[in-house]
């Protein structure tokens, strides 16, 4: 009888130990991934880019008797809980990624997300969202689920009692973004680099639309030689020597235009045939509506207008360039329905290999 009781006690102890280990591995209950039921929101923060995983910071580990398993599939991970704020001095500590800690960067520490990786952090109290780069482990020993740098906490306006939501952003090798953190979200590029303009010639053999691909360089006065002893502007054909027609999309300088030569005919038909103009038929078909298709954002207004005009001529739709802080958004539309905007999205993808998203006119 004593042996039977001893066996029962041992079995009960083993069962309790297993239950305790499982409890240690669990953290905060995982909410369902965000589902997009509204308009696309543009957020800023760290600029997500593809990075290989750190060789030493992505192994399962134990700390203070608690086991931690590294998240292998961030696409199935979301988490909500209280956020901590890491306020160490710059360079005072090394992160798990081997980098010196910098509180001015939009970074965060998480116990189990891959290093390095990116996540959208949402302040559930005020709705603010930013992108942070996960480059460290922690926090430990409290009920916090993530530790934010001071810069990230300030952008989100969080305190030590603020509840946040963590949604990973997955960066593919080609730079495309996916994952829970991209639901109803597009990330504003910090480099504002203009993508390579698509081939708008349709394979017809013309190179008129490929001219503006490079940056527009200033003309050096030292290369211009005037035959006029008074130093009058050069009147030969070329960029400053109109009347030679400029390539479509090329921007004229602010220099005064020389007097037209007698042999030049009045360019009365130029506005009607310029490829940068949107046809009246296209404008009348889509002049009203609340849906826009955004294809990019750049820091140069002139380049944004040039790019929008090229796309408008190619796809036969109106468009606009709007300012948002330091960048200029390139948008096509408006469209009366989201279905019409989606049709243009598909054409942009198949005919010009351009990524875009649908937004509402403001």
Swiss-Prot record:
Keyword set, alphabetical order: Cell membrane, Cell wall biogenesis/degradation, Lipoprotein, Lyase, Membrane, Palmitate, Signal
Location(s), subcellular: Cell membrane
Pfam families given in the database record: DPBB_1, SPOR
Biased amino acid composition, Low complexity: 262-276
One Gene Ontology term, aspect cellular component: plasma membrane
The enzyme's E.C. designation: 4.2.2.-
Record's signal peptide: 1-17
Disruption phenotype: Deletion does not result in any obvious growth or division defects.
Organism superkingdom: Bacteria
UniProt xrefs under HAMAP family: RlpA
NCBIfam families found in the cross-reference section: PRK10672.1, rlpA
Record note on domains: The SPOR domain binds septal peptidoglycans and is required to target RlpA to the septal ring.
Job of this protein: Lytic transglycosylase with a strong preference for naked glycan strands that lack stem peptides.
Full protein name: Endolytic peptidoglycan transglycosylase RlpA
Lineage of source species: Bacteria, Pseudomonadati, Pseudomonadota, Gammaproteobacteria, Enterobacterales
Gene: rlpA
